[in-house]
């Protein structure tokens, strides 16, 4: 039986990942910030906001999956920016300290990250060979998160970092926010509309995470995005068609930056990111085409 330890296991990605892992011979310990009782013999909850939580984590953990982090979908006040950073760094450091104090480190750590690692560009195509230093707040979060995760290599753990693109899911996240203006018939171009949206269907993301965990030759950063990113204007048009709504309005960049503040970078300052590394290992995406991905989700 394989033992998993998961942070963020009750979130959008984590909950679907847990449901998939349960299909195998496994036991899952989920770290949460509140007391929770499990009705499933394959799942245990540990409240790591309480003192002594470390002693409740099983000794023989094989796989650590670190997804914990405050949502980006809130206004980035100075106080919340600190929460965004610390929620990721402190949880990762706490995991590292836990296993550093034990004689048995996990075989593999899968640590979430984001395509915000790469600088925004209308023409550049980014693969995993591109390396950079932080250039804005979001990239600094990503850079520091990855750096703290890489400490696990000192313990002999194989470290896999998944740079998530825009996750398309019916259970929350970006797609629900994107759909909202179209439901009120005010969807359309954002800014220039030329910025890239590197997206991934939630089902492909779950399978990609498990593929990387189970592939012993996988290590380092992986771009977890569909092979065919789209520019925002075409993305919005495709979404509108799937929803049978118009795609006619325009929100200027200046207005969006004034309304959203720094959070507007998530929508306007984006990157064209390609999943070369995971494809080279043989992973096949079920949803490479945006039209098919959106129709699958919106039809449900």
Curated annotation (Swiss-Prot):
Pfam families: DUF1731, Epimerase. InterPro entries: DUF1731, Epimerase_deHydtase, NAD(P)-bd_dom_sf, SDR39U1. It comes from the Bacteria. NCBIfam families: yfcH (TIGR01777). Belongs to the NAD(P)-dependent epimerase/dehydratase family. SDR39U1 subfamily. This is Epimerase family protein SAB0724c.
């Amino acid at each position: 039986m394989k033992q998993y330890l998961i942070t963020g296991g009750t979130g959008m990605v984590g909950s679907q990942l847990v449901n998939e892992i349960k299909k195998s011979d496994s036991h899952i310990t989920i770290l949460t910030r509140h007391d929770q009782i499990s009705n499933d013999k394959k799942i245990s909850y540990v409240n790591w906001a309480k003192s002594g939580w470390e002693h409740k984590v099983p000794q023989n953990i094989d796989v650590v999956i670190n997804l914990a982090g405050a949502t980006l979908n809130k206004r980035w006040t100075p106080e919340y920016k600190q929460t965004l950073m610390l929620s990721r760094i402190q949880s990762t450091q706490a995991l590292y300290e836990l296993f550093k104090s034990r004689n048995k480190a996990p075989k593999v750590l899968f640590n979430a990250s984001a395509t915000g690692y790469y600088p925004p560009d209308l023409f550049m195509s980014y693969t995993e060979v591109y390396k950079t230093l932080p250039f804005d707040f979001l990239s600094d979060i990503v850079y520091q998160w990855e750096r703290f995760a890489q400490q696990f290599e000192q313990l002999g753990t194989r470290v896999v970092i998944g740079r998530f693109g825009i996750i398309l899911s019916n259970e929350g996240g970006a797609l629900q926010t994107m759909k909202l203006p179209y439901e009120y018939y005010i969807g359309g171009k954002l800014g220039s509309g030329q910025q890239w949206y590197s997206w991934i269907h939630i089902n492909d993301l779950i399978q990609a995470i498990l593929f990387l965990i189970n592939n012993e030759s996988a290590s380092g950063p992986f771009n977890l995005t569909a092979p065919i990113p789209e520019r925002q204007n075409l993305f919005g048009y495709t979404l509108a068609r799937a929803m049978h709504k118009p795609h006619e309005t325009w929100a200027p960049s200046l207005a969006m930056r004034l309304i959203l503040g720094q959070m507007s970078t998530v929508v306007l300052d984006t990157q064209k990111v390609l999943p070369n590394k995971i494809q080279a290992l043989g992973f096949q995406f079920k949803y490479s085409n945006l039209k098919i991905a959106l129709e699958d989700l919106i039809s449900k």
